[in-house]
Amino acid sequence: KILRLDISDAASISSSSGSADALEALGVQIDLTPEQGEKLIEEIGIGFLYAPNFHPVMLKVLGPEDQLGIKTIFFTIIGPLINPADAKCHLLGVYQPELVPMAADILVELDFTHAMVVHGLDGLDEISILGKTSVAEVKQGKVNKYEIEPEDFDLKRCSIEDVAGGDPQYNADTIRNLYAGKDEGPHRDFLILN
């Protein structure tokens, strides 16, 4: 079975640049056609699908969202749900706690096999290493709501400064260190959780 991995390009609260920026700094070619992205997933089991290349309307939303400095429901929720890889397992981070149950209900309606909608109660739109995270887990058409915290996974809490990203080159260097086993601190723990 092929692992289908799609990382959307949204700068999170913990970083000033998105995943596409860091991947480009690592030398990854992100400006692929849908056919090239599909071929990568089929051949090696992983691929980065840059949303604007697959859904051109996202280019129209991405610019104003960046200029206004706001997150919209379109890019942060609808964008990941129209995943061109048609992945039925998903980890979806949302930027407001009230979006957790709403997004989970949408995932049920879209017949996702297994998904988690998460919101760090400290404001992160991902599973938080800083404190508690609200989770709505979708499995077999049912939604189970609960909270998790780093200690549930034998991980230590940290501060936002400990996991803050930076410019694309800083983030690329952090990724290299993580995958080389040179970083066993909060960045690693954050990666493990998400």
Q: What residues fall within each predicted segment?
A:
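Short Gly/charged-rich anion-binding patches and loops
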Residues: 18, 36, 102
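Glycine-rich anion-binding loops and their surrounding alpha/beta cores
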Residues: 2, 24-31, 39-194
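Short beta->alpha connector loops at strand-helix junctions that form conserved
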Residues: 8-9, 32-34
